[in-house]
Amino acid sequence: MATINNQATLTFSSGGSTVEVASNKASVTLQGPLTISKRSLETSYQLDNTIVYTVEVKNTSTASLQNVTVKDDLGTYNITATAKVTPLTYVGPAQRFENGTHVGAVTATVDSTKTFVTFSIGTVAAGSTEIILYKVKTNNYAKGATGSTIISTASVTADGVSTPVTFPYTLTDDNYADVVIEKSMTPDPIVDGGVLSYVFVLKNYGNAIASDVVLKDKLSPIPAVQHTYVDGTQRDEHDFSTTTGEYLFPGLTSTYDFAVPAATITQDATTGVVSIVPGTHIVRVDGII
């Protein structure tokens, strides 16, 4: 929005001399007929996750505005002086609300480079408020280190409003653990009376340590559990019921601090691609079948 600045001068005679004095500087903000704001339903973002944005457009004039168009740059930023990457992917659909009432879907167009999405609202009546609600998803250009941000800018234009009215919105990366578990058994086949190894691979794709981890399983048929290993180191601090086959690690009386380290998240300085190497622990439980 433009600012109008103004300063007055005053001349008068005093003691045979002409004196000129200046007033203070007065200023007002010149607001155009359109205003825009943007927010998200989420307070932070995670990698490979959905974000719901809302963009609010108001026609503050006394006349209808035609061909109102909203654009979102999807957080596009420079990775080098000449190269840009876009950390958000538009997934839609986009819904339109007029003065609080849902009026249906709104046409969304993603440009060929996928660096921005455009919404065609059309006519906005005088004094009317339009809200567009839509979904995006973080992709492999979204920075994942703790404290990273995505700054996406929404803008609006209309007939007679050639200079876009903009609103930048910042989301900060969440501090989180994201652990998955994979189980396997070896050998296969197993000979009756042989040692069966239950292998659990724990992978943390988040940027924070997963603490107070507890591994539970119900082993059937019930084996004679011999040992527990974490990354090859024997740690027989488990609980096991020979009646139910229920296995618990660490056990209830264990003081072992079982945690899965945070992922290593890096960004290629040339391509901008973000890579994730999960923090990993491998737990092996040996039992005689």
Kindly label every feature range from the protein language model.
Residues 1-289:
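Exported/extracytosolic protein signature
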